[in-house]
């Protein structure tokens, strides 16, 4: 069987089948195109078959390959961390647009470290901290920071209760917290079945972690600092209300490329609280 024949017989979408074949053959996309008529070595075909079956069983391609591209960089991912989504790049853009020179950023619930590492690489002058309650997730984030050459301080703990000081000093506090409501049908569908539930749902109404962040951020933000939160497409108004209730001013809801509510942010001004 040739490479092209395997691609043709695969039950996967062509783009996914090609990604798996590139992975097992270690060919580039161009090499695979030019060598498509060559016979597949048995070892490569057997590995490709095994990976294809994993994908047919629903396992995300990112977990099968162990990598996911985010903001133009390749991040290590595994079942201990949420797979970075393109929508989260809008959260990064919002952070970068508001980060002062030599600013301080704290990414809570960092997971793979995609947000923290990206901000640190895009703004080497900034001091970036990343924290997570999951030790395996922090190990993955540390690896990504090391592999990509990002300077990030890591802390372990639940939200603001970490093993590092959390005094008022942060220009930006950012998070993509668990925001799917407990029992949501999507948790048992598609890629979400394989991702860590603790990174997806708060096991409550989808807003409990957001409330915790909005309540705790004012005591950690510098005057004029920002809290930025990613959330579900139908949660914009609710998150805006949570931020307003906790003393944030100038609350904005930012859309993603599809025009859906995706990021809500607010500014902390002590004299307005």
From Swiss-Prot:
It catalyses: L-glutaminyl-[peptide chain release factor] + S-adenosyl-L-methionine = N(5)-methyl-L-glutaminyl-[peptide chain release factor] + S-adenosyl-L-homocysteine + H(+). Coiled coil: none annotated. GO terms for molecular function: nucleic acid binding; protein-(glutamine-N5) methyltransferase activity; protein-glutamine N-methyltransferase activity. Gene3D superfamilies: DNA helicase RuvA subunit, C-terminal domain, Vaccinia Virus protein VP39. Keywords: Methyltransferase, S-adenosyl-L-methionine, Transferase. It holds the Pfam family PrmC_N. Its EC number is 2.1.1.297. Substrate binds at residues 176-179. S-adenosyl-L-methionine binds at residues 109-113, 132, 159, 176. CDD domains: AdoMet_MTases. Signal peptide: none annotated. GO terms for biological process: methylation. HAMAP family: RF_methyltr_PrmC. Methylates the class 1 translation termination release factors RF1/PrfA and RF2/PrfB on the glutamine residue of the universally conserved GGQ motif. PANTHER family: HEMK METHYLTRANSFERASE, MTRF1L RELEASE FACTOR GLUTAMINE METHYLTRANSFERASE. Belongs to the protein N5-glutamine methyltransferase family. PrmC subfamily. This is Release factor glutamine methyltransferase. It comes from Neisseria gonorrhoeae (strain ATCC 700825 / FA 1090). The gene is prmC.
């Amino acid at each position: 069987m040739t490479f092209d024949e395997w691609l043709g017989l695969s039950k996967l979408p062509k783009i996914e089948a090609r990604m798996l074949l590139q992975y097992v053959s270690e060919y580039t996309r161009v090499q695979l195109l030019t060598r498509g008529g060559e016979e597949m070595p048995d070892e490569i075909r057997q590995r490709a078959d095994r990976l294809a079956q994993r994908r047919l069983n629903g396992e995300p391609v990112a977990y099968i390959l162990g990598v996911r591209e985010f903001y133009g960089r390749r991040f290590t991912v595994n079942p201990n961390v949420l797979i970075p989504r393109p929508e989260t790049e809008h959260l990064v853009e919002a952070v970068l647009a508001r980060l002062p020179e030599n600013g301080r950023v704290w990414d809570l619930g960092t997971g793979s470290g995609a947000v923290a590492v990206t901000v640190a690489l895009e703004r080497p002058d900034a001091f970036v901290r990343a924290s997570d309650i999951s030790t395996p997730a922090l190990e993955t984030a540390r690896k990504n920071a090391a592999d990509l050459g990002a300077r990030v301080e890591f802390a372990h703990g639940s939200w603001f209760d970490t093993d590092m000081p959390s005094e008022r000093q942060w220009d930006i506090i950012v998070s993509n917290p668990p925001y799917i409501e407990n029992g949501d049908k999507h948790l048992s569908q598609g890629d979400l079945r394989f991702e860590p539930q603790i990174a997806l749902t708060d096991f409550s109404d989808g807003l409990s972690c957001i409330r915790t962040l909005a309540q705790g951020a004012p005591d950690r933000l510098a005057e004029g600092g920002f809290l930025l939160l990613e959330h579900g497409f139908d949660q914009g108004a609710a998150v805006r209300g949570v931020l307003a209730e906790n003393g944030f001013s100038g609350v904005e809801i930012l859309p993603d490329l599809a025009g859906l509510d995706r990021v809500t942010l607010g500014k902390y001004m002590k004299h307005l609280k």
